[in-house]
Every structure is written in C-alpha cells, then in structure tokens.
Amino acid sequence: LLPEHQIIGVSRNNNTQDRNTSWHQWDWLSGRSLELPNEEISTVIVILKPISFDENGYQTGYLKAAEIIIKNLNQSFDYQKLVVMSSTRVYGEKNGRGITETAAPQPDDFRGHIILEYEKIMRDQSKVEPLILRPSGLYDPKQKWMQKFMNSFEAKQHSLSSKESNRFDRNILAKIISNYVAQKKLAELSGIFICSEPPKIFSELFAEQYPDKNFEDFFIASNHLGKSFDFQKLIASNLMG
C-alpha cells in the first residue's frame, strides 16, 4: 500500500524494515521523547493495544499511552491529519441493533469505557479533528474462522454468547486508511466511522469454512441476537473506494 509515500512506523518493539517503511523503536512508557527524521508529517495513524487484558493493562495501553503520544506529537511535529483506531466495543447490548454513529455509546465493560475515554483524549488534545475508525471484530479472509480453536479442540463444546458475528475484513480497513492518506478529496473527512459488515450467523460461517464438519459437535449455539451496526455512513464516505 501507498508505494509513493514514505511511511515511518513507530513501535515499542518492532524494527522491521519494509520497502517504503522505516521503523523506529520508541517505548513511549520509558519517559524518552519521540525523535523522528521528519518534523512535518501529512498523516498520523495511531493504533494502540492493551499491555495486558486486565483493567490496568487497558488503562496503561490506551489512556497513559495516548496522553504521552499526543503530547509528543504536538510538541515536536506538524501533522495535517490524524487517524485514531478505536473499536465497536465502545457500544454495548443496550445500544441494540442497527447502531449508527449518532448513537451515544453505552459500553458493557471497562474495556469499552477505556477505549471511549482514549478516543476523547485524542479528540480533545489533537491539533486537528481526527478520523476515528470503529471496526468490529477484525479478521483475515485467508485464515479460517476460529482455526486455533478447531486445532486445539478436546471434545469440549464452546458456548457462544450470541447467534451472530460482527466482523470486518482487515484488508478493507487497510484500504480505508490508504485511501484517506492518498486521496485529497477525502482529506476533509473527520469524526466517527463504524467499520462493520452485515452480521453473519456463526453456524453459517462455520459451514462455509468446514463444510465436512457438524457445527453442533464443536459449539453450543445461542439464540441471542446481540448488537449490530449500520455502516451506511462509511459506504457514503467513499473511504472504501
């Protein structure tokens, strides 16, 4: 993606060198300042994750990291656009079905609350109005759904909490970001965009990928219809091309 652009990757531990990407290792929790070869950056893309899956890990990985990163960006760099990677986890069961960007998030757990607070930090402290992407469960179309579970199956069925899966192709998400960076006509876009596909029943997903196996042998189905999303704003934006 973006062969005509110079990409600077910043990670706490990744120093892989790609064709048009230079990686810089920076542990933002170390107290050191961010140093990069360029002071002017067209687009900043922030993708954070928890350092552990408990509440403290989420607070450190999202809230503390966000404060440090945006402070360093504002102090030392000029940037024109900011992409903030969030999640549909900010919405809860109380948000119901057909959730749009106008719905006030009602998170179910501390994870959703912390991610929502992370969004607010980035929005309030950024020099520019950010583009906030809220994808549902990201998947790689080249990998079979729940392959890891199937490979380690030991005759104990897995109970599903809902009937359907909310998903989004990670390749399409990459295309959205690429289009936003490269296409001038999209530069004025900002605000929240839900990135999700139509919900799909788990048993149908399983049948597509394991047609010779019986879904009920591996999973205990649920009739509960959880939250679902309306992604018409994303379609209308032309971010997907």
Model regions and ranges:
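N-terminal Rossmann NAD(P)H-binding glycine-rich loop of SDR-like oxidoreductase domains
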Residues: L1-E4
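N-terminal Rossmann-fold cofactor-binding loop
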Residues: G9-N14, W28
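SDR active-site strand-loop-helix element
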Residues: V10, I47, L82-T88, L133-P135
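NAD(P)H-binding glycine-rich loop region in Rossmannoid oxidoreductase-like domains
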Residues: T21-N72
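Conserved Rossmann-fold NAD(P)-dependent oxidoreductase catalytic core, especially the SDR/UDP-sugar
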Residues: I68-D108
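Catalytic helix-loop patch of NAD(P)-dependent Rossmann-fold dehydrogenases
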Residues: N95-I132
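Substrate-positioning beta->alpha
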Residues: L138, K144-K148, Q157-A182
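Mid/C-terminal beta-alpha module of Rossmann-like enzyme folds, strongest
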Residues: N171-L225
